[in-house]
A protein has these predicted regions:
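Short beta-strand segments that buttress and anchor functional surface loops
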Residues: 78-85, 105-111
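Beta-strand/loop substructures that line and gate deep hydrophobic ligand-binding cavities in soluble
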Residues: 96-97, 107-164, 170-172
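Short, surface-exposed coil-to-beta transition loops
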Residues: 28-30, 88-93, 116-121
Length: 176
């Protein structure tokens, strides 16, 4: 009986390790919403990292969040570093591409609670009636340790729910 239990445990562990090993080595999380405002009104809220305080879901998770800005106020080269509690972590982001009223691409470097180097992207598409479809995506490599963690935690749900909240906040800020 004891040997059977040990065998089942070993098989389960090997199954988890094997599943993580064959999982994709890149990830992409994406959410979309429509905002009743033109791209020219939505774009500055994304392209100016100082404006993120008004809508980023992570800003509200740590009232004592430490922020620092560097580079230009907005657009390519604008950077934002943060240091916060366990929910927010520590990291840096820098705008690497900025196409007025159309696209913002950001290099994301997380140091804590885990190290990761990803890309975030905002695409703005004008819609009929003066509204804007905004797509917020994050993508990057998924090393083995992250894939192993994803066996137990659905990162798309965890991060995607924050993107949903952020897009709702962005919508509220842009529609004022």
């Amino acid at each position: 009986m004891f040997k059977a239990i040990i065998a089942i445990i070993v098989i389960a562990i090997l199954g988890v390790l094997g599943y993580a090993a064959i999982s994709p080595d890149h990830f992409r999380i994406e959410r979309t919403t429509t905002i009743a405002a033109p791209p020219e009104k939505v774009f500055p809220l994304i392209n100016d990292l100082h404006q993120w305080k008004a809508w980023s879901p992570w800003e509200k998770l740590d009232p004592a969040l430490k922020r620092s800005y560097s580079g230009p106020k907005e657009g390519v080269g604008a950077a934002y570093s943060w240091q916060g509690n366990n929910e927010v972590g520590t990291g840096r982001m820098e705008i690497t591409q900025s196409e007025p009223a159309s696209k913002v691409e950001i290099k994301l470097d997380f140091q804590m609670p885990f190290e990761a180097h990803n890309t975030a992207e905002f695409n703005l598409q004008p819609q009929n009636g003066g509204s804007t479809q905004v797509t917020w995506a994050m993508y990057g490599p998924s090393p083995y340790t992250h894939r192993l963690m994803q066996v137990f935690f659905d990162m798309d749900d965890m991060v995607g729910s924050k993107f949903d909240q952020g897009l709702m906040n962005l919508k509220a800020a842009a529609e004022k």
